[in-house]
């Protein structure tokens, strides 16, 4: 399967696997920011992705993010 990724900003970091055998890739924001308690924010990643027809990309919390910092993503589905 081929997934096309296009940088929308020069400082964007293309998703990558942190460790061999990881089930998912790490995503990185292109901006630094602070979150206030209970604040919600859309996080800019700086790239676009083309998911093949019949598939979806899933966005999940990084291991320990919620437990250590109380930060929870609302998950995401990137349709083809």
Question: Model segments located where?
Answer:
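DUTPase catalytic domain/fold
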Residues: 1-80
């Amino acid at each position: 399967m081929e997934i096309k990724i296009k940088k929308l900003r020069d400082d964007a970091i293309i998703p990558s696997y942190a460790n061999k055998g990881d089930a998912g890739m790490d995503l990185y924001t292109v901006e630094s920011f602070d979150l206030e308690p209970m604040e919600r924010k859309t996080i800019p990643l700086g790239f676009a992705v083309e998911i093949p027809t019949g598939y979806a990309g899933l966005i999940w919390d990084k291991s320990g993010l919620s437990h250590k910092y109380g930060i929870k993503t609302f998950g995401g589905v990137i349709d083809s």
